[in-house]
Amino acid sequence: MPKKFNETTLSKFQARYGQEIPDNHYPSNQFIEQLLARKSIRRFNNKKIDPKLIEKLLAAAQSAPTSSMLQPWSVISLSEEKRRVLHNQRNSHWLGETKANPDQIRTPTDPGNLRALKECSHFFIWLVDCSILDYVFSDPSLDKKYKDLKIQRERGSRASRELHYELRSIIDTVIAAQTFSLAAESLGLGVMYMGSVRNMDLQEEFSIPNHVMPLFGMCVGYPLSDDLNPFGAGKIDQYEKKPSHIKPRLPQELIYHQDEYKPLDVEKLHEYNSLMESFYSYYELGRDWFYRVIDRTFPLSNSFKKLAAKYGFFTE
């Protein structure tokens, strides 16, 4: 491993940027230091999380900010039996795209993520859930009391109105899930997000009503080790022979602006790409950050748009 990735010589602040930059010596606390060192966990031991702890973590998630107090999200916890169904869904209902043909179905080959799905104590599907809001909008018994408000709501573009609150609902779901995740990690639990859930047709299998859409999955459990590889795909046994290091992030100069947006510092961006190339080479992945950007940011396919519409989202 290059010296700049040797976390024994770097503070957590420096390690987050992957090099010996001037350290920020502003007083910290245990929570911030934990955030600076956080990693996705893909291996879990067989210890089960106490249901009362899950209740506490859900309360933490519900304490997150929510736009206009709408609270438009919910979560499904899957038993091990249902997780096997989800595993099969990954193979039969995957809607990922190949770059050559954006509408071609492809099968995922990520053994690390599949093993995490099997091993974790709890697997959650986080849902953008507008069903309760729809009830309030449409229930006739509420018409008399809220008649004037409902008339005002119907003014203007329906498409614009629904897109606005659907977008707010997605944002709220993400904030709640991340609050849940941070609370779990603060207690020594490991967490891994699984975005592939977003590409699966799960409506019938999990009795998901209209205007409720899976946004991502989340593996939660007790880590098998604090020092595991940060990658799930490919030759996982090969990666696990090497210690896990904190994945460096973009330098703050590229993401922090004062008063107005700064032009892109192309030189710093290329320096970061070289840093990530060195990082990935340690795990023998043979890629850089630019490769990652190009590989993972192809346009939405028609298949995903149709799936979102089936869930009742973005229909206008």
Go through each PLM region and give its residues:
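Acidic, surface-exposed loops and disordered segments
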Residues: 1-316
